[in-house]
Amino acid sequence: MKYLIRLENTRTSRHEALLAFAPIPAGTVIGWGADEHSPDGIAYWTVTSCEEVAE
């Protein structure tokens, strides 16, 4: 199974999406990518939705 994960950047409110092989619950915060304005240099994203996609 594959899952479409929709993300919102916690600092910029930018939206992205990715495919994952396991579900990630909505509300989960993940560190993904770089953010030069973040103290630790990591961009943080909140999962806004997780949908199973047909293969």
Sequence positions of predicted segments:
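Short, surface-exposed beta-strand/loop "edge" segments at domain boundaries and coil↔beta transitions
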Residues: 11-16, 38-42
